[in-house]
Swiss-Prot record:
GO terms for cellular component: extracellular region. The keyword Secreted applies. The modification Glycine amide is found at residue 8. Its main location: secreted. It comes from Rhyparobia maderae (Madeira cockroach). The keyword Transcription regulation does not apply. This cephalomyotropic peptide stimulates contractile activity of cockroach protodeum (hindgut). GO terms for biological process: neuropeptide signaling pathway. It is found in: Secreted. Keywords: Amidation, Neuropeptide, Secreted. This is Leucokinin-8.
Amino acid sequence: GADFYSWG
């Protein structure tokens, strides 16, 4: 998901 650490 579009998180601070995970964009995938």
